[in-house]
Amino acid sequence: DRDSDNDGLADIDEAANGCDPLDFDSDDDEEWDSIELALGTDPAVASSSSRATGVYVVQLPHNRPASPANLKIPLRPFVENADFYLSMDNTGSMTTYFSTLQTGLVTAVQALTCTDLGTSCDADEQCPSNANCSVAGHCVAQTGQCAVNIYTGVAKWDTIDTFVNVISPQSSAASSVLALAGGGTGGGYEEAPTHAAACAVDGSKCLNNTKNCAASGVGCVGFRSDALKVYTHITDANEQCPMSQAARCAMFTPLGVGAEMLSRQIKVLSLYDEQDISGTGTAFDVADGLALGSATQRADGSRFVYQTSYTAVLNDLKTGAQQMFSQLPLTVSPLLREESGDAGAFGPFITRLVADSTLAGCSSATNAADGDNDGDPETYPGVLPGSKICWRMEFGTNATISPGTAAKFVRARLDLRSREAGTVDRRLLLIAIPPQVP
C-alpha cells in the first residue's frame, strides 16, 4: 500500500515532508497532510494551517465521513455600510445649523470612517490585532465606532407638503455640503416634522411635485438596501402643522411613521432643539416618537435622541453615529454564497447549520431563533457589534465528487447578514476532496 493512512499522500512523500505515514493529520490541526501541502501550509506544524489564517477547511473524501465531523465557525459583526440622511428643518431659525454642518460635515464623515490599512485579506486573522477584514476584503482599523463606507444625503422641508429630497445618499460628503447651501430659507413657518419623515419613507405621502424621490433604493430617500439606513432628524421645532391641514396632519403620528420606518429597516438618529416651540407638544416628542416607533434603541431601551444646538450639532451627529455603530443591537443570520470556478457546489453537502456557543468566547445561543424554518435555530437577535457569535456546520457524505490525482476544492463564503445593516462579516470556507494515490 503506497498510502498507508489513505489521505491521498504517498508514504514516501509523507516522509519527505516530515509527516507520519500512518496518520492522515500529522500535526493534529484538523487539516489532512495532503490538503495542507496542496494549500501551501506545513503539514508537520500545527500553527501553519488554513485555519490559522481564518479559512475553514473540511475534508470530504469520496464515500467516507467528513473530517472533521463538523466546522464550528465564529463571526464578528461590525457595521460596514451606513447611510446618514440629514432631514433638515429649512426655516429661518435653522440657518446657523446649516452653516455649521456645511463647515464640518466632510471632516465628521472622515472621522467616522474606518481607516483602510491598504492590505488585502480573506479573514480577520490576516489583519493586525486592532483591525478586521472588511467585507470588501481590506484590513481596516476597527475602533467599534466607525463604518467602512459612509454615504450622506440631504432633505429640506418646512410646513406640510414641502419635503424635497435634495440629494439621495451617495459617497461624496462634499456633494452633501453643496446640497445644504441656501438652507434656512424655507417659505413656510408652520413646521410639520412628522410629515417630513413620512415623506422620506414613502413619497406618496407628499402632495408636492418637487419632492424629487429617488428612482431606486429604499424609500423616497433612496437608501442603499445593504446599509445601515439612518434618518437623521434635525429640527428646532415641535409639531406646528397648519390648522387648515389639521385633519390630514393627524394622519401622521411619530409612532405611526416610525412603524413605517421599521417595516423598511430605517433607523432614526434625532438631533433636536426646543428654540421654536408653538403648536402641539415638544420637539422631543417628535424626535423620540420616531425613534421609538422605528425600534431604534439600545439594549436598555434608550433611544439615540440628543438635545442639541447649532454649536453642538456637528459633535452630536458624530456622537450619535459612533454610538449607533457600537450600541445598536443587530439581528443576524448566516447566508452561504457559492464561489465559482471550482469542483462543484458547497451547499448540497451541508446537512445542518445551527447556532452554537461551545467555542471559547462565543455568545450564548440560548435565544437563537429558527429564521428559515428548517428546524434548527440559526438567527441571533440583539447582537451588539463586535460580539463573537458562532455556528456549527455539519456535512453529509461525498458521493458525487470522485478523487483525482490532485486535491479538488469547493469554495464558498459564509456571509453574516444583519436585518438592519446588510452584510456585517464573512468567512471563507473550503471543502477539500483528497487525491487518490495511483
Question: Model features per residue range: what roles?
Answer:
Residues 1-60:
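Extracellular calcium-associated, cysteine-rich motifs in secreted modular proteins
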Residues 5, 17-20, 27, 39-40, ...:
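Cysteine-rich, disulfide-stabilized extracellular repeat modules
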Residues 47-128, 135-402, 418-438:
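Divalent cation-coordinating acidic motifs and surrounding scaffolds
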Residues 407-420:
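A short beta-strand micro-motif common to beta-rich folds, especially ectodomain repeats
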